[in-house]
UniProtKB/Swiss-Prot annotation:
Ranges per topology, Cytoplasmic: 25-622
Encoding gene (name): SFR2
Protein name: Galactolipid galactosyltransferase SFR2, chloroplastic
Membrane topology (Stromal): 1-3
Upper classification of the organism: Eukaryota, Viridiplantae, Streptophyta, Embryophyta, Tracheophyta
Matches recorded under Gene3D superfamilies: Glycosidases (3.20.20.80)
Annotated transmembrane regions: 4-24
Signal peptide annotation: none
Outcome of substituting residue 267 to A: Loss of transferase activity
Amino acid sequence: MELFALLIKVAGLLATVTVGANVVSYSRFRRQNLAKFRSPIDESKEVLADFNSIEHEEGKFFFGLATAPAHAEDDLDDAWLQFAKETPCSAEEAEAADKKARRKKVKLAVGAITKGLAKNTHGKEDKNAADKPPSKNVAAWHNAPHAEDRLKFWSDPDKEVKLAKDTGVTVFRMGVDWSRIMPVEPTKGIKEAVNYEAVEHYKWILKKVRSNGMKVMLTLFHHSLPPWAADYGGWKMEKTVDYFMDFTRIVVDSMYDLVDSWVTFNEPHIFTMLTYMCGSWPGNNPDFLEIATSTLPMGVFHRALHWMAVAHSKAYDYIHGKISLKKPLVGVAHHVSFMRPYGLFDIGAVTISNSLTIFPYIDSICEKLDFIGINYYGQEAVCGAGLKLVETDEYSESGRGVYPDGLYRVLLMFHERYKHLKVPFIVTENGVSDETDVIRRPYLIEHLLALYAAMLKGVPVLGYIFWTISDNWEWADGYGPKFGLVAVDRSHDLARTLRQSYHLFSKIVKSGKVTRKDRSLAWNELQKAAKAGKLRPFYRGVDNHNLMYADGLDKPQWRPFVDRDWRFGHYQMDGLQDPLSRVARTLLIWPLIMKKRIRKVKIKHTDDAGLVLHPALASPFD
């Protein structure tokens, strides 16, 4: 009995220490990341943001549009096409896929660190997964017409280039595909491995962009590793640095005079995590040991990022070593999500994730950056081993929480860390998947206001690039989520239809201003849809605990627009939602509620009988 009592005391002590540690961690997180701020935007003015008034050493503030080879190019036999085509076709393969799906449970902790999404294991708690066949590698691809055509940007770049030009943007961000230029491993020398016709074709596209009055921002690595490199381990191996430099030299030597700025790597830590830690992207199928040790100092995560950092530094030096009258701008596009804990005991996962993803890669290359590119899409509420679908928050079709304040906070945070280097920023990607186009318009305006507010606070930002021009292939989500300013009809020769957001974006770009009128029109339309209970597509599966699955959906679920004020400077952050935090919050707030419920009567008065009436207590349940 005494032993049992001792165990109870020890358990109670451990629970108290655990709760206390999490409370301290969350308090620190809240001070650093959730502190309230006063918006520097004067909302009483007709012009809320005037980007024309801002100049820097490189010239005026610029607007741009972005695309990438894997999203847009046809006639491309890359890793993504091969990955999409891999599907179980027999009972044996289906059974093997089921076993593999069950094994994904081991990766849940990694999922919380990487993207907070649990892999769909078709378990009993999945309210959407009854009798589903094994998941495909790429959702909404096999059921999409002419899936391999993507946007035909390789054979017909004119459509995308003209659409971009007509908005008035001055920067066109695109990429060159490594596997197209080097379709085979250069074991027998560069000359035999390079497709020089592809090099010339890329030059032809770049010339088209420039002839349409736009500067070129060229990305060298955008989530697409050549299949031959994946076969030997890809970025886990040092020799990939040498091969990447062979590729870089070919591109730079051939296209240097046609390119104005360079992005060596797009979101390197995202590629590393989803490829080498989760195995949910093409290029690797990690085993248990690799997963379990992935975030250790010598684990696959740090190892792959190390070689990508070495590759960036070498590419930076090579580009700057070219003799030219113009000074090149070389940087990376770094993905940053605003992550917050859903409950008190989720602060650990958020802290670990942030420690791995926010600063380490940029820290390792910060001495060799002419700009820091920020890719920002929204916020993520971490809950246990996944991301929570918070019913009171608005989301994109891809499951990203809409949170413009996060861009403001991220820019200030990065500026504070790197201001001693005097490195400017570029928002290299920002956008939202929204087929209805009702969310996209206020999303665009509010994020531009967040960006402008950061600039008013002293953050040097050279430009803003929106993702993307036309609806395209969205990685493992296929053709489900719609990110484009332009809709694409895949059943009718990829016919384009301009969305209203296209015209709004063009108006802002050409005027350089965000007006109060445009903000009100966009926001009021969203509010009208929300109050009417209108539905929109959503391409994430959700379990009975409202945790989102990483797997995309072939066909969307339907979710109502959310009636919540997420405009820049207006968003009210929810408190922690776990049971313990709710109880504690209630206990703390209860005395305040009671005080407010007391009827305060400053002047005594009497009834008809002359008796003194004192203030009465009102029931807190009134």
